[in-house]
Amino acid sequence: MDQCPIPTLLEHGNFSQVLFNNVEKFYAPRGDIMCYYTLTEKFIPRRKDWIGIFKVGWKTTQEYYTFMWAPLPKDQNKDSATQQEIQFKAYYLPKDVERYQFCYVDEDGLVRGTSVPFQFCPDPDEDIMVVINKEKVEEMEQLSEELYQQNQELKDKYADLHEQLQRKQVALEATQRVNKTLEHKVEEKASWEKEKASWEEEKASWEEEKASWEEEKASWEEEKASWEEEKASWEEEKASWEEEKASWEEEKASWEEEKASWEEEKASWEEEKASWEEEKASWEEEKASWEKEKASWEEEKASWEKEKAPWEVEKAPWKEVKAYWWNDLHR
């Protein structure tokens, strides 16, 4: 049987809204019983209402022995009381002689009606003698054995069905967990797809930037080649300067020797100085023409001066001596 949804504690309702009729004091054991009851005009039945058989003295609606779902009336719009009935199968009924009673419980767990107590045993007030021949007894015993075997088969089948239900419940829970995992993976995959699309766009941007870098690199390589050529030119020019410097060093040595001779000649120059004064006038005329040439020499000299700066430092003492002699020469 299905298990009814009942609360753990009894919730008392109005016990007079459902009235039980024709309740016997005794019901024959191992037999089906009919339960007759009346739904009063103010009571509204619902789909999950049920009727249970309770042992007298029960405290909560969980203490039912067995139950049946209460069928809804065919005409629920009637304003008058409605007669209903329900059958309880013998297999589900109590096997002891305790006192029991019917209880009508609505889907909220409230008891809406209770019956008078009854028992499952023969009526002691009835004195009935039943004579059954031997063949009938054997037939009834065989029928009882068959019913017992059917009962055992039903119990075994019920146990198997219950076990199958448990296994299916476990499988269902596992499937639900797998579904949740799959849903999580689908959501995670969608997130990854979005992130991948973002990466693809960023990669395309990097590829364009890389192409730009490659073009710029090619330009740098061309410029580097130009610098290498220019450097080679500078190296050649430097070699030329080194040769020229060596020449100037030789010339310096020559000037040193010449200086010595100039010192010797200086004495004679002093004697000739007087005559040079006379020639100075003519040299002044030539000086004007030299000044014109000097302008062009000065431009050429400016470029030489940049290259000759280190050498000029070394030649400075000689220039002073030469200037002194030159002034003495033109006095």
UniProtKB/Swiss-Prot annotation:
Function: Xenophagy-specific receptor required for autophagy-mediated intracellular bacteria degradation. Acts as an effector protein of galectin-sensed membrane damage that restricts the proliferation of infecting pathogens upon entry into the cytosol by targeting LGALS8-associated bacteria for autophagy. Initially orchestrates bacteria targeting to autophagosomes and subsequently ensures pathogen degradation by regulating pathogen-containing autophagosome maturation.
Name under which the protein is recorded: Calcium-binding and coiled-coil domain-containing protein 2
Chief localization: cytoplasm
Motif range (LIR-like): 190-193
Membrane topology summary: Peripheral membrane protein
Signal peptide region: none
UniProt comment concerning the protein's domains: The LGALS8-binding domain is essential for the recruitment to cytosol-exposed infecting bacteria. The CLIR (LC3C-interacting region) motif is required for interaction with MAP1LC3C, but dispensable for CALCOCO2-mediated autophagosome maturation.
Family of the protein in this entry: Belongs to the CALCOCO family.
Any one annotated GO CC term: autophagosome
Keyword ATP-binding: no
Location of region: Disordered: 189-310
Any one GO BP annotation for this protein: positive regulation of autophagosome maturation
Assembly information from the UniProt record: Dimer. Part of a complex consisting of CALCOCO2, TAX1BP1 and MYO6. Interacts with MYO6. Interacts with GEMIN4. Interacts with ATG8 family members MAP1LC3A, MAP1LC3B, GABARAP, GABARAPL1 and GABARAPL2. Interacts with ATG8 family member MAP1LC3C. Interacts with LGALS8. Interacts with TOM1; the interaction is indirect and is mediated by MYO6, which acts as a bridge between TOM1 and CALCOCO2. Interacts with AZI2.
Segments of this protein annotated with the region Interaction with LGALS8: 292-302
Pfam families registered for this protein in UniProt: SKICH
UniProt feature coiled coil, ranges: 132-309
Keywords carried by this UniProt record: Autophagy, Coiled coil, Cytoplasm, Cytoplasmic vesicle, Cytoskeleton, Membrane
